[in-house]
C-alpha cells in the first residue's frame, strides 16, 4: 500500500549528503522534527524544524544520552495506522505520527580504530539511534527508515521520481537494510567487548567484498570481513573464491613457523 510522508524525524551524526534530501522533503511539504546538532543544521538551512523536546516536554539529559527515548517519539513511530486500538491511543495521548525516520549512527568502529580511550569508545555506543532504527523498521508497513548515509542517494532519487510517497515493497526494502545496519553495529560492539576471548563468532557486514566469481566461473562469490586489513594485493585480477582457498592454505602453512616465512602456491 502506498503511504505519504508527512512528518520526518531526523537524527544523524554526519550531516554530509543530507541537504539535498531536506530540500526535496521541504518541497514536498514534509514537517521536520529533530534533535541537537541535527536540529541546528536543519534550521541553519532555513527550514522550519520542531525540536524533539518540544514534543516530549523533556530536555536532552545525562550529557545527551537521553534525547529521543520517550513514548511521544516511539509511539508516533510504532503506531499501526490500520490498527483500531492504536489509532484510538494516538488520539488519546496526542501522539504525533512519524512517517519517515532518518538516522546516522555514532561512528563506533571508527572510534575504536582511532585508538581512543575506552571512555570515548563507550560514549560512541549509540542507544537512541539504534532504537529509532529498530522501531521504524519494525513498523515498515507505515514508516520509512533510512538508516545509513549509503542510502541517501537512492532515497533522494526516489523522492525526485515519485514525491514523498513510498510503496510497501520500498518500505520493506529499507527495513531489511536497517536490520543489516543494526546487526553489523551490534556485532562490532560485541567484538570490542569480546576482547579476543572468542567465546562466540559474530560477523556482519553491509559491504562484503565482491569476488571475481565463486567456486566456479558461473557462480557469484562474496567475502565477509576486512580482507585489506591483513593482505595487500600487489597485482593481478580481482580475487576469486579459489584464490581465497589458496591464501588460506598459504597462511596455514606459514603459521607453523616462528621465523619469518613465505609460501608460494600455484
What are these regions (language model features)?
Residues 1-55:
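N-terminal glycine-/serine-/threonine-rich phosphate-binding loop
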Residues 11, 78, 101-106, 146-147, ...:
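Short beta-strand segments
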Residues 100-123, 127-169, 220, 225-231:
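A short, charged helix-loop
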Amino acid at each position: 500500500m502506498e503511504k505519504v510522508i508527512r512528518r520526518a524525524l531526523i537524527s544523524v551524526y554526519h550531516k554530509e549528503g543530507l541537504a539535498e534530501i531536506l530540500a526535496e522533503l521541504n518541497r514536498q511539504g514534509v514537517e521536520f522534527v529533530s534533535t541537537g546538532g541535527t536540529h541546528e543544521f536543519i534550521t541553519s538551512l532555513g527550514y522550519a524544524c520542531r525540536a524533539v523536546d518540544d514534543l516530549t516536554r523533556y530536555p536532552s539529559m545525562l550529557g545527551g544520552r537521553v534525547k529521543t527515548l520517550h513514548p511521544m517519539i516511539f509511539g508516533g513511530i510504532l503506531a499501526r495506522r490500520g490498527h483500531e486500538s492504536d489509532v484510538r491511543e494516538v488520539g488519546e495521548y496526542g501522539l504525533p505520527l512519524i512517517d519517515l525516520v532518518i538516522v546516522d549512527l555514532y561512528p563506533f568502529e571508527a572510534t575504536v580504530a582511532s585508538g581512543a580511550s575506552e571512555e570515548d569508545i563507550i560514549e560512541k555506543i549509540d542507544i537512541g539511534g539504534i532504537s529509532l532504527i529498530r522501531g521504524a523498521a519494525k513498523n515498515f508497513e507505515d514508516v520509512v527508515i533510512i538508516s545509513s548515509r549509503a542510502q541517501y542517494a537512492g532515497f533522494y532519487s526516489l523522492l525526485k521520481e515519485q514525491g514523498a510517497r513510498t510503496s510497501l515493497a520500498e518500505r520493506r526494502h529499507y527495513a531489511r537494510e536497517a536490520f543489516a545496519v543494526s546487526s553489523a553495529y551490534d556485532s562490532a560492539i560485541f567484538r570490542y567487548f569480546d576482547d579476543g576471548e572468542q567465546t562466540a563468532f559474530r560477523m556482519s557486514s553491509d559491504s562484503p567484498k565482491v569476488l571475481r566469481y565463486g567456486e566456479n566461473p558461473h557462480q557469484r562469490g562474496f567475502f565477509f570481513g576486512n580482507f585489506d586489513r591483513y593482505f595487500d594485493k600487489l597485482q593481478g585480477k580481482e580475487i576469486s573464491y579459489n584464490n581465497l582457498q589458496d591464501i588460506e592454505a598459504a597462511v596455514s602453512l606459514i603459521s607453523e613457523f616462528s621465523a619469518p616465512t613465505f609460501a608460494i602456491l600455484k
